[in-house]
Design a protein with these regions (language model features):
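Inter-motif core of Ras-like GTPase G domains
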Residues: 89-132
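Switch I (effector-binding) loop of TRAFAC-class P-loop GTPase G-domains
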Residues: 45-78, 84-89
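Conserved beta-strand/loop subsegment of P-loop NTPase cores
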Residues: 103-106, 136-160, 189-199
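Canonical P-loop GTPase G-domain recognition
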Residues: 161-220
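Glycine-rich phosphate-binding P-loop
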Residues: 26-49
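Short, flexible boundary segments at extreme N-termini or domain junctions of P-loop NTPases and their
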Residues: 1-32, 214
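Conserved nucleotide-binding/hydrolysis micro-motifs of P-loop NTPases
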Residues: 86, 111-113, 158-162, 203-206
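Well-ordered, non-membrane alpha-helical segments in soluble/globular domains
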Residues: 118-140, 169-184
């Protein structure tokens, strides 16, 4: 009996490994312009140092599959590169609805720490939160349970540029960079959507990126 159980576990693990490689988890990657969404998309496609990207993304690009490998764990995700200019924010909702996005990565940078009057990150975040909290899509169609994301990651990007510039010794998730987003996080938590805070450099640290993706899928 134990031998049969062992075989069952073995084949179950193989089946799960195949599923994780073949099944693509739909991710939505959103945020204000120039926070590093295109850099993240490039990092997920080709692992390594990403060169500076000057061209701005317009609208919603076609989604594509990305293979995520770290510590022997293999996952496949599907994501689109979506413009962060305010004129494209409405297309975040379209992307979420069309692809039935399960996981969202909302990217921010440190501009609101450098300049208190800069509200780019906060306005984009509140827009996304409002879209998710609404019980109906903008076309009036009522949302179903599957239309809500499983989890949201708030990724503080460009850490290589700002992490050492602030006298902060606590957990990265407690860093002041996340403070303006806590109210939205609480609102999402209240409807059962967990939010995961993460500090990352999409440009230069592929391990941080891949580990962040895998953690979201595993934990939520």
């Amino acid at each position: 009996m134990s031998l049969l159980a062992g075989f069952a576990v073995f084949f179950a693990e193989i089946g799960m490994a195949i599923y994780n490689r073949v099944h693509a988890y739909p991710f939505g990657i959103y945020g204000a312009e120039r926070v590093g969404k295109t850099t993240l998309a490039r990092q997920l496609q080709t692992r390594g140092e990403v060169p500076d990207i000057q061209k701005r993304t317009k609208g919603v690009q076609s989604s594509s599959r990305k293979l995520i490998k770290i510590d022997g764990d293999v996952r496949t995700i599907r994501s689109s590169d979506v413009g962060g200019q305010a004129i494209y924010w409405k297309q975040w909702e379209s992307d979420m609805k069309k692809r039935n996005v399960q996981y969202i990565i909302f990217m921010i940078d440190h501009r609101h720490l450098n300049k208190n009057f800069n509200m780019d990150n906060q306005l984009a975040w509140q827009y996304l939160v409002d879209v998710i909290l609404k019980k109906r899509w903008s076309n009036g169609k009522k949302k179903k349970e599957k239309d809500y994301p499983v989890a949201i990651g708030i990724w503080a990007n460009k850490s290589d540029l700002w992490i050492d510039g602030y006298d902060f010794k606590g957990e990265p998730s407690k860093h002041p960079i996340f403070e303006p987003f806590n109210m939205g996080i609480q609102q999402l938590n209240e409807i059962g959507i967990p939010c995961h805070k993460y500090v990352v450099s999409a440009k230069s640290d592929s391990e941080m990126v891949y580990r962040g993706i895998t953690t979201m899928i595993k934990d939520y």
